[in-house]
């Protein structure tokens, strides 16, 4: 993910800073304890697509709908 873009992105809920988790390919808001996925290099900043960081990444991974 482009570092210049990371400087501009904020949590869509609290407008707080996000941390890039390279291991899980997510942007993490520590204040809201949510992780937003990065898919094909694009951050999905929708609350409905975020997972609680209390929940393991594998549990909340959405099914691959591209067939």
UniProtKB/Swiss-Prot annotation:
<dbReference type="Pfam" id="PF03966">
    <property type="entry name" value="Trm112p"/>
</dbReference>
<dbReference type="InterPro" id="IPR005651">
    <property type="entry name" value="Trm112-like"/>
</dbReference>
<protein>
    <recommendedName>
        <fullName>UPF0434 protein Lcho_2556</fullName>
    </recommendedName>
</protein>
<comment type="similarity">
    <text>Belongs to the UPF0434 family.</text>
</comment>
<dbReference type="GO" id="GO:0005829">
    <property type="term" value="C:cytosol"/>
</dbReference>
